[in-house]
């Protein structure tokens, strides 16, 4: 692998992880804030809100893990090499 391809792969891997973490990070913050607000308004619905929040947080975190997988493929099993 030449040095230009290696450098581009490292930069692409960094962008994959960084950009894949921005969206879910913002979404998780908004979801947690809305859940806290909902629990404050209706404490009796805390169980349902918490369950829905945890499920949605898991789906959002999956997007970040996909970005990590793409970065690892670019670094260790580079299809462009």
Curated annotation (Swiss-Prot):
Site (Reversibly protonated during proton transport): 61
PROSITE patterns cross-referenced by the UniProt entry: ATPASE_C
Domain of life (superkingdom): Bacteria
UniProt keyword annotations, A-Z: ATP synthesis, CF(0), Hydrogen ion transport, Ion transport, Lipid-binding, Membrane, Thylakoid, Transmembrane, Transmembrane helix, Transport
GO molecular function: lipid binding; proton-transporting ATP synthase activity, rotational mechanism
Matches recorded under InterPro entries: ATP_synth_csu_bac/chlpt (IPR005953), ATP_synth_F0_csu (IPR000454), ATP_synth_F0_csu_DDCD_BS (IPR020537), ATP_synth_F0_csu_sf (IPR038662), ATPase_proteolipid_c-like_dom (IPR002379), F/V-ATP_Csub_sf (IPR035921)
Membrane topology term: Multi-pass membrane protein
UniProt-annotated location(s): Cellular thylakoid membrane
Xref: Pfam families: ATP-synt_C (PF00137)
Residue ranges of the TM segments: 6-26, 57-77
Biological function: F(1)F(0) ATP synthase produces ATP from ADP in the presence of a proton or sodium gradient. F-type ATPases consist of two structural domains, F(1) containing the extramembraneous catalytic core and F(0) containing the membrane proton channel, linked together by a central stalk and a peripheral stalk. During catalysis, ATP synthesis in the catalytic domain of F(1) is coupled via a rotary mechanism of the central stalk subunits to proton translocation. Key component of the F(0) channel; it plays a direct role in translocation across the membrane. A homomeric c-ring of between 10-14 subunits forms the central stalk rotor element with the F(1) delta and epsilon subunits.
Homology family: Belongs to the ATPase C chain family.
Subunit structure: F-type ATPases have 2 components, F(1) - the catalytic core - and F(0) - the membrane proton channel. F(1) has five subunits: alpha(3), beta(3), gamma(1), delta(1), epsilon(1). F(0) has four main subunits: a(1), b(1), b'(1) and c(10-14). The alpha and beta chains form an alternating ring which encloses part of the gamma chain. F(1) is attached to F(0) by a central stalk formed by the gamma and epsilon chains, while a peripheral stalk is formed by the delta, b and b' chains.
Protein's recorded name: ATP synthase subunit c
